[in-house]
Amino acid sequence: MITSNIKQRIIGKGRGAIFAPTDFLDIGSRASVDQALSRLADQGQALRHTGQIRRLARGLYDYPKKSPRFGFLSPSADDIAKAVARKDGQILQPSPSMAANQLGLSTQVPSKPTYMTDGPTRTKKVGRQVIQFRKASPKTLVGAGHKTGVVFQALRYVGKDRVDSQIVDRLARALDDNDRKLLAKQSRHVPAWMHPVVQQIVAHA
């Protein structure tokens, strides 16, 4: 019953979803969830062509997307990092360079995906992906888990002397009205030089 319920929830999330045992503790105990996921992953390994549940690493699974040309695809570093943080009960924020790339302020793709976290500094290898987690101060993690956090990190990448109207415009367009309200509220916890920039973003029509 537990295995069936877990499988239904996974399939309901759709292909590309990544998950950990902690995502299913409302269904059963940790031991029973571990057993169910292991059983589903073993079934998927035996029936690779069906694209069932796949074990990515210890305590980390996915329901892989499929491409007509390339077959089952590997999950993105961003999705993996979020799942790892969720599994370990940590908060997560992209590094300044990653945030700038995500918001279109930089075309440079970091060679190694790096995330700031309230957990220990470590490197996590999942399949071909090598992801760096760096312990950061609470001020660096303001807005973590929201678009606002990505904006603050992107501003760190740009720097106070390089912010112009084009950057303000791009950042403003990345946020909806609720995001802008949250940005204004959270800005009290970021460096003072960001305050006037945040005001411009919030006021942007």
Locations of regions flagged by a protein language model:
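Short beta-edge/loop segments at beta->alpha junctions of small alpha/beta modules
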Residues: 1-83
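Positively charged, aromatic-accented nucleic-acid-binding surfaces
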Residues: 2, 27, 82-84, 90, ...
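Short coil/turn segments at secondary-structure boundaries
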Residues: 20-21, 112-114, 167
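Fold-independent oxyanion-binding glycine-rich loops
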Residues: 21, 118, 136
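Amphipathic alpha-helical interface surfaces
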Residues: 33, 95-96, 147
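Short gly/ser-rich loop at a beta-strand->alpha-helix junction or flexible surface loop bordering the NTP-binding
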Residues: 50, 55-59, 85-127
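Short, aliphatic-rich beta-strand segments
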Residues: 130-134
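Hydrophobic alpha-helical interaction segments
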Residues: 136-205
